[in-house]
Amino acid sequence: MSELTVFSTIGVRSAAEGLFQSYEKSSGIKLAVTWGTAPMLLKRIDGGETADALVLSRAGIEALQQQGKVVAGSEVALASSGVAIAVKRGAPKPDISTPEAFKQALLACKSIACSEPSAGGASGVYFAKLIERMGIADALKPKIKYPPPGGFCAALLMTGEAELALQQKPELLHIEGSEIVGMLPGDVNLITEFVAGIMSGSKNTDGAKALIVMLQSSAAKAVFQAKGLEPA
């Protein structure tokens, strides 16, 4: 069985895992998938690692394009996602319907899980800047809990380590037992676009092309939507 290597952001993992399995069954090609935040994967590529297909944030793909590491014209927008708040299923849901209500919910909670900014996850970096801008960083810092780098914030809801979790919506939905409170309100939110591409030097460009075509299919779009992403 031939093999196709894929570097994919965890931002699409909730949808892509099943889609990748479907591709393996239909194509007979084994996928060797490495999951991580876009910055984690970019660091591995900078260190000399390679893949056939990439699924990253648009910023990640563009950074690689500037280095000549993505086949020109191969990039395709797949879906986009915003940042959401989740609680453990059945727990009280705070009001986050306006920026002020969101701010008060953060101040009132006992603990909140988010991605560690140093790991480079888009939502974690954004949240650190957001609470500074809102003037509540000092009040929140003792409450913030981090999963392992590349991990899922909602997992800390299940262990009782966090009362709220903040991350890309599909990443929150990846954890069974989490429940979405809502998206961050209005212009407080951050929208991330996820893009696929073929890495320069791929040993299986035909397989990578076929995978990307499948990820654009109407069936794939339905899966993206069901998992909290907005299909392109």
Tell me what each language-model feature is.
Residues 1-34, 39, 43-50, 58-68, ...:
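Exported/periplasmic ABC-transporter solute-binding proteins
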Residues 55:
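DPxDG-like acidic metal-binding loop motif
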